[in-house]
């Protein structure tokens, strides 16, 4: 039964990290509704790592698209590669905002912004923002022709995903659509942009709960990691195909229902 809990956490993380509904909110709320423990920082860090590995594996040709070259040329290639530079630029805002919160308002963040009421209200706000994105005119910006200001703008919106209930994929895909991206590439760039952001979040969780790793044990964490990895791959593959010809409507409706359910159970 204990291992089923880790499988559940892995499924929730893997699916909701990429489906625009907020993984943090679902991990917290579903744990509360089912009467099971909050996954905690150590488990959260491990299962987030599963999502990062899934992104790296799924997009391995985009990230490591090189033929046999010397190490020096490969490093030069990485440094000058447009996509990787865009991801780096888009990650800057969330690093600055996340660091500021950790330094200046850590208690307010944990006690107020992570409350169920806050998550419900944020879910409604995100539903409205996603509606604006879904209603916007289809654009022509894509992975190949975007510029660094495009990636930085999306990165600014990604920074708000620090707040529970926002959904990193939801806010980045929506902001990309509003700023003129094609649907399929908006989702693809969102997932790629998530690699450093999710990795940094996992590192912060790991550092803050290092001792807890030893109490949980290796095998339960491994179960959570593998479950997250597999469910993340399924979510990425499904959503890239889905967004190539569909909008955000179904997720907008879900976010409204999710917010209402939380409010009714306060």
Swiss-Prot record:
InterPro entries: UppP (IPR003824). Its EC number is 3.6.1.27. One of its GO terms (molecular function) is undecaprenyl-diphosphatase activity. The keyword Transcription regulation does not apply. It catalyses: di-trans,octa-cis-undecaprenyl diphosphate + H2O = di-trans,octa-cis-undecaprenyl phosphate + phosphate + H(+). Catalyzes the dephosphorylation of undecaprenyl diphosphate (UPP). Confers resistance to bacitracin. This is Undecaprenyl-diphosphatase. It comes from Prochlorococcus marinus (strain MIT 9301).
């Amino acid at each position: 039964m204990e291992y089923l809990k880790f499988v559940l956490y892995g499924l929730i993380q893997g699916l909701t990290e990429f489906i625009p509904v907020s993984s943090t909110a679902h991990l917290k709320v579903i744990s509360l509704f089912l009467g099971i423990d909050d996954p905690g920082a150590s488990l959260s860090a491990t299962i987030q790592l599963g999502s990062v590995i899934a992104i790296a594996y799924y997009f391995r040709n985009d990230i490591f698209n090189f033929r046999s070259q010397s190490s020096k040329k490969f490093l030069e290639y990485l440094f000058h590669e447009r996509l990787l530079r865009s991801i780096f630029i888009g990650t800057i805002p969330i690093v600055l905002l996340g660091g500021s919160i950790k330094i200046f308002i850590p208690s307010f963040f944990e006690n107020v912004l992570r409350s169920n009421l806050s998550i419900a209200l944020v879910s409604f706000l995100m539903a409205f923002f996603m509606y604006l994105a879904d209603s916007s005119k289809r654009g022509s910006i894509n992975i190949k022709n975007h510029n660094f200001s495009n990636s930085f703008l999306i990165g600014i919106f990604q920074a708000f995903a620090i707040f529970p209930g926002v959904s990193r994929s939801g806010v980045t895909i929506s902001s990309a659509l509003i700023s003129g991206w094609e649907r399929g590439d908006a989702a693809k760039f969102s997932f790629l942009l998530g690699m450093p952001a999710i990795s940094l979040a996992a590192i912060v969780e790991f550092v803050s709960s290092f001792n807890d790793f030893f109490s949980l044990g290796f095998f339960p964490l491994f179960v959570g990691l593998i479950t997250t990895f597999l469910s993340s791959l399924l979510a990425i593959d499904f959503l890239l195909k889905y967004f190539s010809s569909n909008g955000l409507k179904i997720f907008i409706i879900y976010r409204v229902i999710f917010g209402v359910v939380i409010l009714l159970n306060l």
